[in-house]
Amino acid sequence: MSKDRGVVKRAIVTPDKHVPLHDVLATSVVRQAIEIIQPDLYIDLGDLGEWGSVSHWQWKRKKKPPVEYIIPKVEKEIESVNLFLDEMDSSLNKAGCKKRHICAGNHDEWLDHFVSEYPYLDQYGFKKAIKADERGYIYHQAGDYLKIGKMFFYHG
């Protein structure tokens, strides 16, 4: 008897990594699981990055520095998150998983709020910063539900 009997779709769902604060060992285990399980789809439920450089909490009760001071920190975080995604994508590619979703979380939205404040820096918006389209991810805005079959996925 096949162990897959009755399985409609197999998915790996990962919430709240908060890169660069993520657990590297746990991430390694998830990557190994992806390669073994060979899921039909991958869902990132949001808060992919911590994005502390653009957090409204960062400057609470303090004067916000000029944007020229913030940009290098944002770029460093973007680089870190993209390296993380490169590793995840490598495992997803090995597993043959082509269907990939990413739901923006509240932390991810902070990048978009930053762009709202500095519209000429639109390359720092979350979707563009993580290269969602280039990577082949189906992007879902924060607050939107992702429905697959009878299941709903949401970053709450």
Predicted regions and their residues:
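Acidic, histidine-bearing metal-coordination/catalytic regions of metal-dependent phosphoesterases
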Residues: 1-22, 28-32
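Residue-level signal for the start and early helices of compact helical domains
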Residues: 8, 102, 137-139
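Structural motif
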Residues: 10-11, 41, 151
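Core catalytic region of metal-dependent phosphoesterases/phosphodiesterases
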Residues: 20-133
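Charged, low-complexity C-terminal accessory regions
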Residues: 118-156
